[in-house]
């Protein structure tokens, strides 16, 4: 299954897969992580399933990376869980969250898998949402702080960064994602 040497694809082509922290990690109440808006919605809104365990990547990341290597992956695009890194409004960094992602990144690199990191994939911390979330200008400074922490912690090994996954979904499926507060006519207003 190793397509890395297929002559049809150019040298350096990145073979791999992608995931989102909320879809694969699980461990939503472990390692200092606090709730994200998607955690609350995954328990109550269709089509989401409860993400408390998900694929349990939080506990099986090393095995998961081994499987990626066996499949011939040369890249893995994953997201960081903002509430695992900055769990509270005091802005303090969670060392357990940083260590989890450091270990994952190091393991990927040990298997010659390029980490591609998405900074936000629907998992705004509940504490940010309680301040108004994307509708409040304070989110600019909060997101900036989070991003700078990530660059400082992982930037020596991560070359490829994505800021926000599927920005359009914030509008199109805002209600499902927990972003409909203060927007009674979200269905009409999204267009």
Predicted regions and their residues:
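Active-site mouth loops of central-metabolism enzymes
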Residues: 46-60, 134-138
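Internal amphipathic alpha-helical repeat/solenoid segments
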Residues: 57-66, 87, 97
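A common structural microfeature
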Residues: 12-14, 58, 75
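Catalytic domains of carbohydrate-active enzymes, especially glycoside hydrolases
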Residues: 60-81
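Active-site region of glycoside hydrolase catalytic domains
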Residues: 2-45, 88-89, 98-191
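Residue-level marker of alpha-helix boundaries and capping positions
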Residues: 55, 92-95
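Glycine-rich, proline-tolerant flexible connector loops at the mouths of alpha/beta enzymes
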Residues: 80-93
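Short, conserved clusters of charged catalytic residues that mark active-site
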Residues: 1, 53, 60-63, 145-146
């Amino acid at each position: 299954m190793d397509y890395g040497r297929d002559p049809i694809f150019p040298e350096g082509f990145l073979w791999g897969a992608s995931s989102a922290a909320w879809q694969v990690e699980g461990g939503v109440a472990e390692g200092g992580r606090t709730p994200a808006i998607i955690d609350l919605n995954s328990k109550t809104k269709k089509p989401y399933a409860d993400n408390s365990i998900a694929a349990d990547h939080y506990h099986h990341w090393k095995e998961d990376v081994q499987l990626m290597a066996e499949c011939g992956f040369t890249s893995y695009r994953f997201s960081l869980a903002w509430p695992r890194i900055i769990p509270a409004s005091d802005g303090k960094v969670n060392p357990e969250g940083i260590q989890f992602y450091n270990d994952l990144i190091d393991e990927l690199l040990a298997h010659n898998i390029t980490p591609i990191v998405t900074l936000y994939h629907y998992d705004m911390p509940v504490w940010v949402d309680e301040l108004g979330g994307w509708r409040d200008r304070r989110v600019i400074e909060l997101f900036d702080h989070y991003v700078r922490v990530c660059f400082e912690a992982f930037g020596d090994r991560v070359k490829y960064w994505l800021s926000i996954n599927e920005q359009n979904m914030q509008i199109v499926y805002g209600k499902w994602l927990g972003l409909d507060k203060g927007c009674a006519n979200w269905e009409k207003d999204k267009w």
